[in-house]
């Protein structure tokens, strides 16, 4: 009986550690993306230029801030669902 209990406890500890680790990694990645977005103003400028537009700095900043607001809203909306 002691061997069975030890095996069950080892399996439960392993599963708990795996789930806890996945949770912590997910939170860390979300924080990293919130602090350092993958898209910057230079990428927006390149994107607008690739579409045949000659982007002004005001247009670049407008599009960049719009994208950042959408990302923050999506992140907040995702947190509400949980």
From Swiss-Prot:
InterPro entries: UPF0154. This is UPF0154 protein SPD_1662. Its main location: membrane. Belongs to the UPF0154 family. Keywords: Cell membrane, Membrane, Transmembrane, Transmembrane helix. The keyword Transcription regulation does not apply. The keyword Membrane applies. GO terms for cellular component: plasma membrane. It is found in: Cell membrane. It is a single-pass membrane protein. The chain crosses the membrane at residues 5-25.
């Amino acid at each position: 009986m002691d061997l069975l209990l030890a095996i069950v406890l080892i399996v439960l500890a392993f599963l708990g550690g795996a789930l806890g680790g996945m949770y912590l990694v997910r939170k860390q990645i979300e924080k990293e993306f919130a602090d350092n977005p993958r898209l910057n103003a230079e990428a927006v400028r390149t994107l607008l230029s690739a579409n045949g537009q000659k982007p002004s700095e005001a247009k670049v900043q407008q599009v960049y801030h719009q994208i950042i607001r959408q990302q923050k809203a999506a992140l907040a909306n995702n947190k509400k669902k949980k």
